[in-house]
Amino acid sequence: MGRVYATSDWHSCDFYKEVLNQLNEDDTLYFIGDAIDRGPAGIWTFNALWADKRVIMLKGNHEDMLAQYLTSEERLQGYVDVNGGDVTMQSMSGMMHEEKEWYIRTINKLPEEIVYHSPKGHNVILEHAGYSPFDMPHRSHDALWDRTHFSDEWNNGFSRDGLDPKTTYLVHGHTPVHYLKFIYGFKDKPTWTMADFREKEEFFNDDLEKMTIKPEIICYCGGHKFDIDMCTVITDRIALLDLDTFEEIYFDRENLKK
């Protein structure tokens, strides 16, 4: 029996083949969103993940934006102008209408959440952005975009039918671990809002020295939440988290491309 991993936010990196080649044939990889945009590989990173039978894909906010943009360019011009969708659209420029329709259908069918039941007896909720256990059920928008749940106390207010909070964990991406380490600090404020995040994000993004530090997975919220977003487009690093043992595995572009 192979190993079961989670990863996220590859953002059109150009070393996706090398990472997939590290997996064994009987491994399973949950990709929890944002295969596309910003990086040089365009749509091809998404295509490779989708075609790999070992990979189970979840929707990220960037996939959701792509599907909306392909449906109506006027609805979401910011996808291209602000969110790195220009690279993805360039890689799709020669595609027929039917091919683009396939992406819309495929993305819209991707799950926003999966619960992995480990044979070791614990459960792992997989979701792109993560969420607060106080907010169940939560909106689809939050599953893809939320950045307000980082100060939660896991065992207080947990509300998921059939899941014991003591043996349940949440793995998410969407927010680069740099942000949690340098912006939130986990101690600055008792609660966070998106306005708080935007206020500090503007200053943080100008500090490229912090952004290029090789990141590692952050485990927080009393050991029950894991952020696995390595900001790959800047750091050239991808993280895999073993969902049974919680072992962390890292792949760096400079090592794989030798």
Regions found by a protein language model. Name each.
Residues M1-A48, D52:
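N-terminal active-site segment of His-dependent metallophosphoesterases
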Residues A6-S8, L29-G33, M57-N61, E127, ...:
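Active-site neighborhood of phospho(di)ester-bond hydrolases with catalytic His/Asp-centered motifs
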Residues G39-Y116, K120-N123, P133, R139-H141, ...:
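Active-site neighborhood of divalent metal-dependent phosphoester bond hydrolases
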Residues A129, D135-H141, K181-Y184:
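A short secondary-structure junction signal
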Residues S118-P119, E127-Y131, G173-P176:
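Short, well-ordered beta-to-alpha junction loops that form the rim of enzyme active sites
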Residues H11-F15, D37-P40, E63-A67, P133-F134, ...:
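Active-site environment of divalent metal-dependent phosphoester hydrolases
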Residues V115, L126-H128, L240-D244:
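Short, well-ordered beta-strand micro-motif
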Residues G162-K258:
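Acidic, His/Gly-rich catalytic cores of divalent-metal-dependent hydrolytic chemistry
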